[in-house]
Amino acid sequence: MSNFYEQYPKFDWKFYINVYDDLRKAGINNEQAAIQHFTNYGCKEKRRTHQIIQSNTSISTLPIQQVIGHVNQCYVSDGLSTFRTRFMDFFQFNDITSTEEPCVFFGVYTDSDLQSLLKHTGLKYIIWGGEDANYHNGQARATLNEIKHLHNVEHLAISQCIYTRLLNQGISPIFVEFNMVDKTLFQPIPRNELGKYIYIFNGQIPGREHVYGKSVYETVMKRLPQYKYILSNQTSVEHDLMPDVYKQCFIMLRLTTHDGNANSVQESEAMDIPVIHNQSDYGLKWKNVDDIIAHISQCSV
């Protein structure tokens, strides 16, 4: 038996018996019998001998072009309309013209989004935006459940948060690298050239402040009245002028519980501006208001 394990060190006799019904029906139920069967028959038949793939918590990302580089058309949800032009230009997409050809669908927020997916018979690549995959939200939960009924769909997660949420809903996504930041526009700024403001990302438009930690950042503002603040949803600036806004600030707050791609975080990272944000590798992590205030104090020096 020792010679056998020298030749087949990974042989798992219990696994070997459990995965083959014919062995159990033949009364093979112990180590010696399993080894004998494998030696006489299983080896020649290339039968499996042990578990190869086990649970793996390490998630590797794929370049998004590797997944959708061959696709020419896209559909962008109205829920992500502020990104539409940049998204289409970045990937050189055309508006959707054929329901039979592969198509990228960016965001699933509205009835129109679902109707477009339903009538598309070709291969569908859904790039989830963030809040549309938040199953704690009743609307998103309904959307996720409906999406499961579609066929010929590849799901793309642009953040680990989205990846985990989709997995928890029984959807197996591809985790992709997604960064549309124009680094010729968003360039590093020396720390001593940054302004004295605190930039708070609380959405593109008023009405969704709760998603970005309204109660938390308002507490921060009350406890730190000596600072001036810029709120994103009160700032109407063309995208190519955003670097001028960012460099007025020495730190950004994006206090989400769940998040998508966090484009503002990527832009700040490109400019070397610190960001308090839990859902990105770059962000400074926080658990409570005191943590946030401590980060602000350290970065203001």
Regions found by a protein language model. Name each.
Residues 1-60:
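Charge-rich, low-complexity intrinsically disordered regions
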Residues 102-104, 118-136:
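Active-site proximal beta-strand in glycosyltransferases
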Residues 134-155, 247:
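Membrane-proximal helix-turn-helix segments that form the acceptor-binding/catalytic region
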Residues 154-165, 171-187:
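Donor nucleotide-sugar binding/catalytic pocket of nucleotide-sugar-dependent glycosyltransferases
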Residues 243, 265-270:
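Short alpha-helical segment that forms part of, or immediately flanks, the ligand-binding pocket
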Residues 247-260, 273:
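Acidic donor-binding loop of glycosyltransferase active sites
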